[in-house]
């Protein structure tokens, strides 16, 4: 694959929301069931009363951002819906949103961007408020009612957003979403949202959950075919040959990546190259490209969780709680509690044994490879070389 193609895949990976709507739709090859489930609900909903709000959950790279963008574009392009329903697609990272008020301010700004004639005055009015979230929502609500319109807000990294809101703001947002039909929320999160599972939290059992599971063999083939089409006719022929003649190579990569689409896209070139000598060189290049994804994944963790992940990743093979505690010098109870959270964040898998001493392993093996290549010794890197030979 030429450099420009590699670059285009890179953009698709990390800047999905900046891609042209038609290009994104053309490359939308997986997560179709999840898309149809939510899209049909949006289509049939009149929002005469408060509608169901969704939370899309999945590990980083599972396809949440692409799915949210696809839904937002579809609302905007639907002739019937777009007359009264305005899609508000927030950026994957919204560093300017620090409170519920700034959340409403950002929505007012996006409304003004999409329809300056109707909503510029709204944005100006909200901008002049003194940090009052209640007044900000009241203004937005009134302007929407006056224009006989409603909004559907697509929020990636909803968990990060919730962390910045205090308890009062959580309660206020819950009240708005529960009682006001002018707004609907479709969120995404790369970790299980504690607010949804905490019985004492305002958002307990509030969202309809959509879990993005690892893609299966058929979906893997669809993704590879889509990538090949974007690359060229020769790539289409090559990938079809591999699917027919070497399905085991594709299955090995799927298991290695735990079926995470973003990582599979990055490994596309290695799959195409097969048993050529350049395979290991491509692996090194791919390791470098996965750094933004995996470093972000590590940054999401607490200090104790990072230490536990480090111990398991450096070991490669599964470890017991006792072994992890010895390596990290953390109390066994602390390790056990953090392992539960790491499983909820899809970082670690539990391997049950016949005893109480269960084993724990890094769930996505390619993440473990990245960790060894980035932080391991020469011996660790030789392990990766052997693995590459195995894939060939």
Residue ranges and their predicted role:
Residues 212-246:
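Conserved small helical "lid"/interfacial subdomain of P-loop NTPases
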Residues 72, 157, 187-193, 215, ...:
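A short beta-strand-to-loop transition that corresponds to the Sensor-1 phosphate-sensing loop
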Residues 57-89, 339:
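P-loop NTPase Walker A phosphate-binding motif
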């Amino acid at each position: 694959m030429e450099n420009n193609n590699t670059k285009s895949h890179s953009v698709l990976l990390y800047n999905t929301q900046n891609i042209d709507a038609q290009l994104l739709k053309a490359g939308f090859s997986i997560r179709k069931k999840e898309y149809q489930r939510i899209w049909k609900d949006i289509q049939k909903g009149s929002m005469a009363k408060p509608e169901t709000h969704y939370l899309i959950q999945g590990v980083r790279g599972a396809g949440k951002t692409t799915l949210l963008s696809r839904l937002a574009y579809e609302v905007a392009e639907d002739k019937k819906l777009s007359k009264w329903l305005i899609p508000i697609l927030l950026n994957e990272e919204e560093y300017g949103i620090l409170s519920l008020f700034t959340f409403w301010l950002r929505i007012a700004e996006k409304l003004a961007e999409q329809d300056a004639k109707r909503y510029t005055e709204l944005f100006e009015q909200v901008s002049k408020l003194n940090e009052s979230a209640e007044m900000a929502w009241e203004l937005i609500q009134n302007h929407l009612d006056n224009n006989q319109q409603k909004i559907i807000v697509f929020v990636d990294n909803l968990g990060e957003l919730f962390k910045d809101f205090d308890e009062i703001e959580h309660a206020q947002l819950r009240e708005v979403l529960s009682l006001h039909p002018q707004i609907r929320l479709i969120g995404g999160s790369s970790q299980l949202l504690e607010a949804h599972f905490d019985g004492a939290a305002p958002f307990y059992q509030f969202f309809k959950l959509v879990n993005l599971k690892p893609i299966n063999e058929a979906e893997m083939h669809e993704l590879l075919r889509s990538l090949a089409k974007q690359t060229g006719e020769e790539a289409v022929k090559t990938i079809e040959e591999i699917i027919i003649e070497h399905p085991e190579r594709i299955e090995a990569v799927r298991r290695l990546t735990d079926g995470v689409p973003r990582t599979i896209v990055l490994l596309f070139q290695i799959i195409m190259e097969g048993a050529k000598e350049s395979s290991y060189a491509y692996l090194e290049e791919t390791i470098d490209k996965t750094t933004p994804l995996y470093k972000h994944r590590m940054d999401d963790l607490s200090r104790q969780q990072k230490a536990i992940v480090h111990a398991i990743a450096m070991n490669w093979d599964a470890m017991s709680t006792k072994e992890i505690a010895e390596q990290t010098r953390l109390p066994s109870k602390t390790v056990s509690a953090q392992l539960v959270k790491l499983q909820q964040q899809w970082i670690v898998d539990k391997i049950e044994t016949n005893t109480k001493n269960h084993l724990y392993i890094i769930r996505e093996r390619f993440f473990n490879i990245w960790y060894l290549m980035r932080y391991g010794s020469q011996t660790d890197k030789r392990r990766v070389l052997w693995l590459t030979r195995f894939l060939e």
